[in-house]
Structures are given as C-alpha cells and as structure tokens.
Amino acid sequence: IAEENRVLERLDVDLIDLNIHRTPINCIQLLIAFLNDFEDRPINRSKVFKYVLKVIFDNPGSLFYGDTLDEENCGFIVGYFCEYLLRKNKESFTEDEFYKITRPFCEKEYNPSNVSDLLQVLKNNQIVVGLNGELRFRFSYWIYYFAAIRMKDSEEFKAYMLNDKHSLYFPEIIEFYTGLDGRSEDIVKMLINDLSTLSNKVHSKIGLSDDINPFKEIKWSLNETVKGMTQNQLEQNIKQSKVSDEIKDIVADKNYNSIKPYTQTINNYLEEYDIKNLMELIKSSSRALRNSEFIKPEHKEELLKNIAMAWKELMR
C-alpha cells in the first residue's frame, strides 16, 4: 500500500476520526479499504464501509458465490433485514430467521442473489458473529449503516425511522444516511427546523437572560474582588432563571463537592429541560453538515447558523 509507518499513522488517524473500535478485524478491514485507494481519505464512515464491502465482494476468492452477489446487493438485502430488526427491536437472530425474511423479499424484488452465500460472506468477515446460539452484528454501527441504505430505498421506512424512532436524535443514523450520497436535503431541512424549534424551547424553559456573560470580568490575573463579582453575577442569573430549585441549591452551596451524589439531579435537569435532546441534535446536524457536500449553499449556511445558535444555547 505504502511505506509501513505511513500506513500505520493513517490507520491510527482513521480509527480515531471514524470512531471505529480498535480491533484486529477492523484494522484488517480498513487496510483492505486502503487497497482501493490509499490517497483518497474518506471523510465519513459510509464511504469506509462501502469500500470494505466492495473489496470483500470483489475478492477473487469469493467469485464462486455468483456474479450477482456484490456490495450493492448486500446493502439492498441486508438493509431490508435490518429494517425488520429495528421494527421488532431485535439485536440477535437465527440463520433460519434471516432466510425467512430475506428470501421472500428477494423473490418479490426479482433479485437472484443467494442469501445463504450472502450470510456466509458476512460471517466469514465477522460483520455478523455468533453469540449464545444466535447471530448478531458484531458492532451496532453495521445495523445503522444498512438501515440508512434501506431508508434511501424505502420512503415508508424512512418516515418510520424519522417519525416513530425519532432518528434525527440518533447521530449515527443521520451520519450514515447523509454520508451515502451527500445529497440529503430533506434531512438537512428537517434538522434546520428542529434545531431552531428546540433551541427556542430550551431557552424558554431555562429562562436565563440573553445578555448573561460570566466571563466579561475575567482576566489572566484574576484578583479576588473581580472573582467574587463574576461568581456573584453568575449566581444571580441562575437564581432569576427557571431552572429547578435543586439546581439552584447546588449552585448556592459554596462548599459543593463534585463527588457527592448530585449526578441524578443533573441528569434529571438535562432530561427535563431538553438539554440532552439538543446535544444529540447538534451532533446529528454537525455530522450531516460535514457529509452534505452536494446540497444547496444556502442550506449549508442555514444549518451552520442554527448549529451555532444551538451550541450557544447549550453553553448558556
């Protein structure tokens, strides 16, 4: 592929940037993807997984599986099966279950792929592994990747994922969906709208004033007087806000010890004031913006503006 240290450095960077588990099989699959084009560094995991599947099915040792079995057919068939898993809230399955779901689907779609061979390829490459007498995807991101492909193929399933499963708040699904072709303006428009709505909702619930700036008086050489002014300003703004009394009590406690059991209170606060939802929506939107290379410039600009607005609200 290239000089040894260069390949190792590239492998390490990709594992970190793509948030993929550092396991031998993942390292091997990335190295296989490098064979496709080492100079082309993918910016999203959708491209990585597509490269991996393409090399797996283009492997000369796999040709006996038949000419119709390739990464496109794999995504088409396994995407449908992952729809079944998500609708049933299942993580594991049997071989018979896989055949029972996929064979009628292939017949209906006039797809001649051999699903027995397909499953064997997935098992041979440890995309699907055995556990307690059943099968499951080795890593959950494979389910989300194939589900994203299915969302492209089925408007009905896409509507189900976005409405019933609230997939806008699942960054991995949005990342894979937008990363498949870089043209998902429909999702980007939804993210723009939801970011604006949720940011305003969080702002209204928390009730902190727009002009709060606890850092205004902070300097590199902070004296005790200015420090006290800054702390008092922050505490006063919190007292006048709409956050819960429990949070106000914690802030008011001068001897607060971070190891004391206030974690549940903070978690309840994040839930009650939609902070967690906003955090996940920011993640989804950021990944969508990164992956959406071919949407209209005005949509990119508006999404970036709303991400910044939501981030400001989160930091408040």
Description of each model-found segment:
Residues I1-D153, N163-L168:
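Extended hydrophobic
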Residues R150, E155-R316:
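Extended amphipathic alpha-helical scaffold segments
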